């Protein structure tokens, strides 16, 4: 097989590179390594800063499992380890041989200081990576959101370059990409639908999360499979010291987390659950027809770990979530995600660290019609099984090498309609589609000098369409050209791609730098939707004989400047992203139950470019940020608008977000957000006619119109319980849409009932002002 030969060549090149560069640095240096943990809980700390100063000065950060490694010559050094919310650890060390130094940081609660970042104070200036943001969990808990439920995805949409797919929607667009072009990972497992209650909530329970990182551009080579961004979310490992309880009770939802040790300092667990209870209020409704209806979601995060010995640690984590919507004796609808990750961390030696992961991910939905004589059930699902092997090798203080490979087996069940005997509905089963996605990568973080840093790498990916079903080909007009059945195990067609990645920074001084990056990304799984917002019933397809991988090349350039002793951050980034093999459907296409959906697809290209400005205050009683995005996103298809470029649905030229958090005294925290964006690009009718007594419309150019601009002000206040008590609690009071703005959710056109010859536009709004209150506790 072509891939196996290329993979062997790839591994050989890695081996030669390792041997060559290792020999260069295997002189008189010794290795200092260890793991950074919280002294209170034993939780490993991601991105903790480790600095060594003495005869030389070097620094690094702990990886996703708290591990760090540095190469230094023999001598006496001062070691400093810092992480936000923890007291800085300082120790004088003597290096005479390879050494291991694990560090337990003590929590430090300074009530007069609220901070936004968990990295070195000038990390944003000195690192080579650009277009990357880390969200602090405490900030997420302070930002006011809908119904008072703290939401990672809603907070994410307050950053420049990341735009909401709509009010009450967890979908988001990154630098002109579609909502399915974001790789969303929970403990390395992909999440296909990251929303609850049709998008009003995200799948991520912030109580269970310890780290959130988003890459908007120049994504590292270990990530692949999506065009626009990576959202890497990591769950808490669990408290290794003592058993604790944490939760909250709100107006429509409650949550509870339990964590503690199996064996103190060696293994731990974490279980966190949520459930809404809107259905409980329906049971009290005066209208008896509403009492049997169902509307709720639940989710459960669970994780356990066990340190087998000093070199091996085992992790098992999972997520299980479900939404249920039903009308009594008439209709039922449920959907949800399930993920599972089994990981083994292994330390080969003081410089080579590995992580092996077995991953599963499933998304499915079912729709039931319960009306007598018309009963039927519709079901659809996506199943992934993934094997990953990642290595990190500290070659020297100048080089940190990462390399690995992964394989993902995809199975899509597009849809099945089943019905009982006596139903008028015919049964239908659309054939499953199977695919095998393989990738290998290598990247090097290279500190060329004190001023110049590089992160460069290469990802080699392939996608093979697998047999087990019938595959057809279609011409440009959607007419069938051929049809053939392929047996299980047969390779129908394979696609191969090289994805180079490079990021570079030049440090002008301690507080200023300029950066540039380039990345090619490939996407093999594609979302089809008839609506402008994400929906639980959206259809995924994979590469086939007709559908090729989507491609994107992103070029970025930025200026970064810290002010006032690194208390303020400013950045300006510009980007340009051409896209190939973009997918649209023909006018009038209905995706539901469509057995030949590929016949209704057309292929074109896209482009996105823009400017992102970001100003952030990190420290002090008052902090927050201001983000502004000026951008343009367009698509071009030969069969749409005579082949002219048109506004993509993601196009919102102006987007502003303002976030403020104020610590007032020892117990009160006030926060507020303001958001503004250009209205959605939509298509309005330009004429109408009567057909069989019904009004029909002629529509203008694709997305040639806009809904009214969107803006909203939110506010929240948090009252902390009395300090220095073992039982901790707080009250959170919030107002969503404080000035009751009627933002457009949809625009409908209908005949004016008073003058049928006239057409009127009717705006539908989703939310007015919504108050919320939540009681949080921890003991």
Feature locations, PLM:
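C-terminal beta-signal and adjacent terminal beta-strands/loops
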Residues: 667, 676-693, 708-714, 718-779
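A beta-strand signature from Gram-negative outer-membrane beta-barrel systems
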Residues: 103, 158-159, 203-246, 255-257, ...
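Periplasmic N-terminal accessory/gating domains of Gram-negative outer-membrane beta-barrel systems
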Residues: 117, 121, 126-180, 186-219, ...
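Gram-negative outer-membrane beta-barrel transporters
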Residues: 575-578, 597-686
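Short, acidic, small-residue-rich periplasmic hinge/interaction motif at the N-terminus
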Residues: 37, 41, 48-53, 82-86, ...
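Outer membrane beta-barrel strand-and-loop segments of large Gram-negative receptors
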Residues: 384-390, 429, 437-439, 542-548, ...
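Surface-exposed extracellular loop regions of Gram-negative outer-membrane beta-barrel proteins
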Residues: 364-365, 411-422, 464-478, 506-555, ...
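Signature of Gram-negative outer-membrane beta-barrel scaffolds
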Residues: 407-511, 640-643
């Amino acid at each position: 097989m072509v891939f196996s030969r290329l993979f062997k060549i790839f591994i050989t090149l890695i081996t030669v590179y390792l041997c060559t560069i290792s020999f260069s640095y295997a002189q008189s240096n010794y290795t200092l390594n260890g793991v950074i943990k919280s002294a209170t809980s034993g939780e490993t700390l991601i991105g903790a800063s480790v600095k060594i100063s003495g005869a030389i000065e070097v620094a690094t950060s702990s990886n996703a499992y708290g591990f760090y490694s540095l190469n230094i010559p023999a001598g006496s050094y001062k070691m400093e380890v810092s992480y936000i919310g923890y007291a800085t650890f300082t120790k004088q060390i003597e290096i005479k041989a390879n050494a291991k130094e694990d560090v337990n940081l003590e929590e430090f609660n300074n009530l007069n200081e609220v901070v936004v970042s968990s990295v070195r104070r000038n990390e944003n200036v000195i690192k080579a990576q650009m277009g990357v943001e880390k969200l602090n969990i405490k900030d997420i808990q302070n930002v006011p959101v809908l119904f008072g439920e703290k939401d990672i995805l809603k907070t994410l949409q307050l950053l420049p370059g990341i735009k909401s797919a709509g009010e009450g929607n967890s979908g988001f667009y990154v630098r002109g990409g579609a909502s399915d072009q974001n790789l969303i990972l929970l403990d390395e497992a992909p999440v296909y639908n990251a929303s609850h209650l049709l998008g009003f909530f995200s799948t991520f329970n912030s109580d269970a999360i310890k780290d959130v990182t988003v890459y908007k551009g120049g994504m590292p080579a270990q990530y692949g499979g999506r065009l626009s961004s990576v959202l890497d979310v990591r769950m808490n490992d669990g408290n290794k010291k003592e058993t604790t309880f944490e939760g909250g009770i709100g107006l429509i939802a409650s949550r509870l987390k339990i964590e503690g040790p199996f064996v103190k300092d060696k293994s731990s667990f974490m279980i966190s659950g949520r459930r809404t209870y809107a259905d409980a209020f329906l049971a009290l409704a005066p209208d008896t027809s509403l009492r049997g209806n169902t509307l709720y979601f639940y989710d459960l995060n669970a994780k356990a770990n066990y340190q087998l010995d000093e070199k091996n640690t085992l992790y098992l984590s999972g997520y299980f979530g479900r939404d249920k919507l039903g009308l009594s004796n008439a209709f039922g609808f449920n959907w949800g995600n399930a993920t599972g990750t089994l990981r083994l961390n292994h330390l080969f030696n003081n410089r080579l660290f590995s992580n092996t992961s077995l991953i599963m991910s499933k998304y499915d939905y079912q729709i039931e019609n319960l009306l007598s004589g018309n009963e039927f059930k519709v079901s659809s699902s996506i199943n992934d099984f993934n094997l990953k092997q990642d290595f990190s090798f500290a070659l020297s203080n100048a080089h940190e090498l990462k390399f690995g490979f992964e394989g993902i087996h995809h199975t899509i069940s597009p849809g099945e309609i089943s019905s009982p005997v006596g139903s008028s509905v015919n049964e239908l089963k659309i054939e499953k589609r199977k695919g095998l996605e393989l990738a290998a990568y290598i990247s090097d973080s290279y500190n060329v000098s004190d001023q110049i840093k590089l992160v460069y790498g290469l990802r080699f990916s392939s996608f093979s369409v697998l047999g087990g079903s019938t595959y057809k080909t279609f011409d440009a007009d959607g007419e069938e050209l051929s049809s053939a059945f392929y047996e299980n195990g047969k390779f129908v067609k394979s696609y191969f791609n090289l994805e180079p990645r490079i990021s570079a920074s030049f440090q002008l001084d301690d507080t200023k730098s300029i950066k540039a990056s380039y990345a090619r990304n490939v996407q093999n799984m594609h979302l089809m939707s008839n609506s402008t917002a994400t929906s639980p019933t959206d259809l995924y397809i994979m590469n086939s004989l007709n559908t090729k991988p989507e491609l994107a090349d992103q070029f970025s350039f930025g200026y970064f400047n810290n002010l006032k002793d690194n208390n303020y951050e400013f950045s300006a980034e510009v980007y340009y992203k051409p896209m190939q093999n973009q997918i649209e459907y023909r006018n009038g296409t209905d995706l539901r139950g469509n057995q030949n959906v590929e016949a209704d697809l057309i292929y074109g290209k896209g482009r996105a470019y823009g400017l992102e400005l970001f100003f952030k205050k990190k420290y002090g009683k008052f902090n927050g940020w201001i983000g502004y995005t000026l951008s343009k996103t367009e698509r071009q298809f030969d069969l749409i608008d005579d082949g002219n470029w048109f506004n993509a649905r993601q196009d919102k030229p102006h987007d502003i977000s303002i976030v403020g958090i104020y610590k007032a005294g020892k117990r009160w925290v006030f926060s507020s957000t303001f958001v503004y964006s250009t209205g959605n690009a939509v298509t309005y009718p330009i004429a109408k006619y009567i057909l069989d007594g019904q009004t029909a419309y002629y529509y203008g150019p694709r997305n040639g119109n806009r809904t009214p601009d969107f803006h909203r002000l939110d506010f929240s206040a948090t009252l902390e319980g009395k300090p220095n008590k073992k039982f901790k609690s707080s009250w959170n009071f919030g107002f969503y849409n404080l000035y009751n703005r009627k933002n457009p959710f949809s625009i409908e056109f209908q005949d004016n009932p008073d003058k049928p010859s006239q057409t009127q536009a009717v705006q539908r709004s989703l939310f007015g002002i919504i108050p919320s209150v939540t009681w949080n506790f921890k003991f």
